[in-house]
Amino acid sequence: MNAIDHELIEEIRDSARDFLLRRDQRQRKRKAAAGDREYWKEIASVGWLGMSVPEALGGLGLGWHAMAAVLEEAGRAQLPEPLVGAGVLATTLLARIAPAGDAGPRDRLLDAICRGERVVGLAWQETEGQLEAGEAAGAFGVTVTAREGAYVLNGEKRHVIPGAAVDGWLITADGEAGSALFYLPAGTPGVTVHAHERADGSPACHLAIESAVLTPDALLARAGVLDAVDEAIDYGRLMQSAELVGIARQVLADSVAYLNTRSQFGRPLSSFQALQHRLVDAAMQVELAANSLLDALNAIAAAPGDAKARKAAASRVKARAARAGIEASRLAIQLHGAIGYTDECDVSLYFRSALHLGAWLGNATAHRQRYGALAPDPAPPADDDDGEDDASDAQFPRDADWNAMPEAQFRAMLRRFFRTHYPDALRHVPWRLHWDEIKDWYFTLSRQGWIAPAWPREHGGMALSPARQIAFIEEAERYGVARAPDQGLVMLGPILIRYGTEAQRARFLPGILSGEAVWAQGYSEPNAGSDLASLRCEAVIDGDELVVTGQKTWSTLAQDATHMFMLVRTDKTVKKQAGISFLLVDLASPGVSRRPIRTLSGHEEFCEVFFDQVRVPRDNVVGELNAGWDIAKALLGFERLFSGSPKHASHALQQIFSIARQRGLLADPAFTDRLAELRLDSADLTAMYRVFADLARAGRPLPPELSLLKIWATETHERLGALLIQIAEEYGGAAMRLGYGNGNVHALAPYVNALAATIFSGTNEIQRNIYAKQVLGLQGA
């Protein structure tokens, strides 16, 4: 498939689930049924063994997204057969190699594997902890010498899976002519199989080889063997990650069902918030792994020849999936209590499988470190001169097919624009700027037509894809562009586009784009923060007007705003969610007063706004009267999507690298290990953000799963901020700009700002409650 056919992939997933459910795979695994050759042929008959093999080599050519869907279902069902070990690794390697001479032996072997007639493993590893082929040559390596028209192998291979019930192994060997790949039939004289079991009962072995003689047609390849093996192993890691995601999803589902049916202390176990939040945190790891896998497969499909990027992606995904699978299944045992520790309880079976897969082909720690070594360092904050020539305004098109433009060109254009037009005095400011400080920049973007990157073109936006939006955000952060007052752009605009009337869109959208109208949000009230539906600010109908009386608080930069979109209570006789309306208010109206709130950082970023019988035209109600709650939830979705943007984490990482480079911390293994973990967290945040940004761009409702994005983004930002304070040493407590790199490091700002973000848009604790109830389905949540 050239393009990813998601509908076809879901059909493949459904078909795989149906096939697996015809047998009780859990019982088959308990009975060690992995050596059932007839069932292996059934697996081959549905196309799984040749699914990712190119059609030109006799496979289905359906690609890795389809294979991942199958492996996820295999993990959920607990298929005992070694689909990765005897399917993915062998077929991928054989499809990738350049045959040595006649391609016939390779083609016949590949065909036999795809038809299920041969079960073949891959023997590549020479020592514990090895992540790439040939990495430990000389420790337990296999050597080959040519003798009398045959090949003689000597040496050892370790941790070979499958290690039993196989017809043979693909094996790497080193000789005078370099590395080579051979097919080693099982039972070859001189080969001793030291068998052992994995945690889940999967058969594995070490191979001891002493003067094993192979015929000439056993030589499969010479050129590029190590690279081909590395590629096969990386795809194996991606597919075992899909299997780990399936394991984690199933144990979470089993745990939810168990908690919903069991009671203690006179209450359902599912009603205990401590258990709810533990399940939500486990689910977060699972969704991060799933999104990371999807992101990696998309990136690899777009640039299949980039070996370094593939390796980094495989390690990133394996590190997250191993953590997700082990943590979720470990939690499932805890939540099931004593029964979870027994063999008869299915969650223990999943736990053992997660332990096996999590360690095989490299564990989470090893892959986190590999990812840290392979992933490109964040670009340092842009200097005034980055080697690019300044450009005239004519070189900055107001409109173009931005999504078709090569990303490097798009980013370079943004950098030139920022350098040409953004005020140098406002770069890298660690607090929110007021309208009088930033309005000229807002007007510049407005004139350029770049003020609304995410809006559709028909409403004056750039219609950027999520990938281009992220590029826009990253380049703005890199240059130090401050965030302008954007409540109208980020929140109200999308609401009016979806829910407003034509008259309302015509009246209000142009003012948002031009900067003529500056909007503030009016949601929170005293005693109605996360419990937003408890709001008391009321609007009483009086003819063609509504009379508003009450108070709003925590309204960002409302002292600078000209207008406010707000929630008001318009009916007190119904349940609290049903009597709320969404209203647009001119803050110049008589009866409006404002009082700034000084935050712990010393800045007046928020306001209290008071309404004393403020008259508002009834035409300013968005949607139906008393039907504002659904709009409110949609707007909160946009707000949480914005809170979940990776830009804050990206900026904090840049500052960490600025200090780390100057202090020599990148040579400290303890520091780089911690940094690699946080970089992985940030990368997976970006992957999760893309999923929800795609939904928003398509105009689809943002689901309650969005709560996970808000939690992960803000808590990742907080962790990064804490590391920044730590490595800044004494300056970690200084409220000043530091002289690292280009002098644009503010050690305190990311941490302090992240603390606020974990509270706004619904506290992270409330987000966990939402997810527990609306997504996991925990009763009593």
Residue ranges and their predicted role:
Residues 81-89, 163-167, 484-493, 516-518, ...:
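FAD-binding core of FAD-dependent oxidoreductases
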Residues 134-135, 139, 159-160, 185-221, ...:
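Flexible, small-/acidic-enriched active-site or ligand-binding loops
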Residues 123, 150, 154-192, 545, ...:
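A short core secondary-structure module
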Residues 530-531, 546:
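Hydrophobic, small-residue-rich alpha-helical packing segments that form membrane-like cores
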Residues 116-128, 171, 515-523, 567:
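A short, Trp-centered hydrophobic/proline-enriched beta-strand micro-motif
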Residues 1-78, 82, 100-105, 112, ...:
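Alpha-helical interface subdomain recognition
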Residues 62, 133-138, 162-166, 464-466, ...:
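Short glycine/proline-enriched turns and hinge-like loops at secondary-structure junctions
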Residues 47, 71-74, 184-188, 211-213, ...:
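Short Ser/Thr-interspersed hydrophobic loop/turn segments at strand-loop and sheet-helix junctions
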